[in-house]
Amino acid sequence: MFRKARRVNVRKRNDSEEEERERDEEQEPPPLLPPPGTGEEAGPGGGDRAPGGESLLGPGPSPPSALTPGLGAEAGGGFPGGAEPGNGLKPRKRPRENKEVPRASLLSFQDEEEENEEVFKVKKSSYSKKIVKLLKKEYKEDLEKSKIKTELNSSAESEQPLDKTGHVKDTNQEDGVIISEHGEDEMDMESEKEEEKPKTGGAFSNALSSLNVLRPGEIPDAAFIHAARKKRQMARELGDFTPHDNEPGKGRLVREDENDASDDEDDDEKRRIVFSVKEKSQRQKIAEEIGIEGSDDDALVTGEQDEELSRWEQEQIRKGINIPQVQASQPAEVNMYYQNTYQTMPYGSSYGIPYSYTAYGSSDAKSQKTDNTVPFKTPSNEMTPVTIDLVKKQLKDRLDSMKELHKTNRQQHEKHLQSRVDSTRAIERLEGSSGGIGERYKFLQEMRGYVQDLLECFSEKVPLINELESAIHQLYKQRASRLVQRRQDDIKDESSEFSSHSNKALMAPNLDSFGRDRALYQEHAKRRIAEREARRTRRRQAREQTGKMADHLEGLSSDDEETSTDITNFNLEKDRISKESGKVFEDVLESFYSIDCIKSQFEAWRSKYYTSYKDAYIGLCLPKLFNPLIRLQLLTWTPLEAKCRDFENMLWFESLLFYGCEEREQEKDDVDVALLPTIVEKVILPKLTVIAENMWDPFSTTQTSRMVGITLKLINGYPSVVNAENKNTQVYLKALLLRMRRTLDDDVFMPLYPKNVLENKNSGPYLFFQRQFWSSVKLLGNFLQWYGIFSNKTLQELSIDGLLNRYILMAFQNSEYGDDSIKKAQNVINCFPKQWFMNLKGERTISQLENFCRYLVHLADTIYRNSIGCSDVEKRNARENIKQIVKLLASVRALDHAMSVASDHNVKEFKSLIEGK
């Protein structure tokens, strides 16, 4: 025994081809007889088979034409075997005692259980194969007789694919029942046909059975239409259609879910779709006719057909069933099938046969069965009539579409052609320029390696260069600071000495003002005084030898003489630093520290591959690259010294002077042209800034003149970088200004003595006063040397407000009125730049000189008053001094004060004095 799958779908078999033919031949019996070939021997519940799957007919031999259960009316003239005409289906219900499976179960719901689990018994055939062959031969003879009828029903047969012998393919011969897994649509169509069949023996077959098998898209012929009309007329005459729902007890529901509602509920019974067991196939009929009950049908299939034929039949069945699929989400207990209406134009409408598909179990379907009518609805989706204009419009649209497509393709073609031309040109250009790529790559790789090695070398040597540069700057700074400190000490010593004499203050013999021991301090002061006097004597002797003794004034010379010890120490340290600088690159190849070698490498790059040279911004990198090497050469360069070498005459300057200068025309944006100016900006200006802060002495006229000279040279020679907008230039000028202010605050000192002390011109206080006065005038001249570099406002603030009005005018107040004062005033006015007074408008001078002009007017009045009552010679000298004062006032453009002095003292040569200024 074999256990089959739980899910069993039992359906009624479609009419076979032979049954259709026999049905057409047996149209003559009385109307009350069942139509031939309709399969009415099987009731709605599948009456020809018991639930166990066995035949209802008892065993025993009977003629094939009358007693074979599978052939029925097809071979026996439309009556079942052993039945009289008019008996209907009663013989089919007789052999219920032969069922063996129901006796095996005593349960009340054995029918439902047996539907889910069927048991088959395989019995061997007791007849010979000759009987089978004989039956086949007789079957073929019957097939030839009904050939004409088969052609009429060809459209109906297209719904059921048959094999070459006319047998309906049995898809589940081994199970004994039909499990329609791949043919759900066929099952639903058969169930719908089953609905139209009558349940009594006198019911007429549904006339639409042949119409339902019409394949969608197939045009019916005249014979098909005639047969349909004839069957429809017979259905009207009989009028004994009985709905299947009237006998729910004969039906059997196949439930796919064990949780469905109970069979006892009438509502559930009404909602179920009734399936009938598929009728036996021709092979099964033959097998039953020869007495092989429950035999395995696969043996016959294996003997008759091969596997290929079976697959072909499967394909034909799937092709024939061209019906939309059933909705998958229907409830299990309802199992309603709604057939979708075809959206295309029905072909039957052209023959005047309206039709429509209706759902099974609907009210419309029931009314059709009751009234024995076949109502068909006219489809709403009629086809639009085809006109010439419509065809022309479609053709025109098609033509426009093709033209547009052609235009697009043509544009694409032209685009591809142009792309091809461009690609060809690019290939030619690249092939022509690829000759030197290898050499270029090799050269650039060499330059890359060279630059990396150079940077690694500089990263190691630059800290050493910075240390040496700091050492040399510190050395010069110490020397300058030492000289400034010595000058300040000398001024303090003389001031304290002469102040005590003038005030005649009594001081403690051994304590200073801070309570310290004065013995040690006085000892150092005596040693400084001795050294100071010795230096003055040596300078005086030097002036006598040069013949400048007559023009010299005390205080105009700079006391920058050093002792031999200081000079020796300074030179030793300087030499040591110079030797250390020479050892910086002693372990390096010349190509990595020589400016000429480095320059030649980049010049080769520039001349061969200028584009890549420019793209790499080498012109902007060279000043920074040469910076350490140039600073090393400028290590001992100090423009304050007399023997200092001009930087433009040094080797690095001459080597880089013509860098980038080639025969070809220079580009406007070529940065190599500005190589030297950039080096001056990055190297020279920072060097000068350090010198101005730490080494320059504004009291020294020589140093000031050299600083002014180098600054003017940079301004005039490199105007693109040395200007007021340049950052490094601003830093340099700021350093100069701060140094001048510091000198003005720390080094200028003007003593104040009573006139009776200054009467003795050989006394110490008088000489010290004169020396400080002339040193202040000298500083005034040094400040005013920066005219043209600093602004007029800055210079006037420093020289006039900070020095003249603050210190020098104070000295004029304590000086003797006479020739000496006029001489001092003349020297002060000579320090002023002439450009200050050339563009003045009106009769007034600059506002800062107003106090100085008032002093000159007061000096003229004093000279005139002192000459009253004196001799004519003294009066004549006084008058000459007044004229000189008028001339001095006119030289500083103080015309209002000059006219006032001239009118007060009857100076008639005023105009000539002004013009002679």
Swiss-Prot record:
Q: Where is the composition biased (Acidic residues)?
A: 16-28, 183-193, 257-268
State whether keyword Nucleus applies.
yes
Result when mutating R538C: Found in a family with global developmental delay and myopathic hypotonia; uncertain significance
Query: Which residues are recorded as modified (Phosphothreonine)?
Result: T563
The entry lists its GO molecular-function terms as:
DNA binding; histone methyltransferase binding
Question: Where is it localised?
Answer: Nucleus
Q: Where is this region: Disordered?
A: 1-123, 143-205, 229-275, 362-381, 530-564
Top-level taxon: Eukaryota
Q: What residue spans carry the Basic and acidic residues bias annotation?
A: 161-172, 234-256, 542-554
Question: Per the annotation, which location comes first and is thus the protein's main one?
Answer: nucleus
**Post-translational modification Phosphoserine, affected residues:** S16, S154, S155, S158, S191, S262, S295, S557, S558
Keywords annotated in UniProt: DNA-binding, Isopeptide bond, Myogenesis, Nucleus, Phosphoprotein, Transcription, Transcription regulation, Ubl conjugation
Q: Which GO terms describe its cellular component?
A: cytosol; nucleus
Q: Pinpoint the Glycyl lysine isopeptide (Lys-Gly) (interchain with G-Cter in SUMO1) cross-link.
A: K149
Q: Where is the composition biased (Gly residues)?
A: 40-50, 73-85
Record function comment? Adapter protein linking the transcription factors PAX3 and PAX7 to the histone methylation machinery and involved in myogenesis. Associates with a histone methyltransferase complex that specifically mediates dimethylation and trimethylation of 'Lys-4' of histone H3. Mediates the recruitment of that complex to the transcription factors PAX3 and PAX7 on chromatin to regulate the expression of genes involved in muscle progenitor cells proliferation including ID3 and CDC20.
The protein's assembly and partners? Interacts with PAX3 and PAX7. Interacts with WDR5; associates with a histone methyltransferase (HMT) complex composed at least of RBBP5, ASH2L, SET1, SET2 and KMT2A/MLL1, KMT2D/MLL2, KMT2C/MLL3 and KMT2B/MLL4 through direct interaction with WDR5.
Protein's recorded name: PAX3- and PAX7-binding protein 1
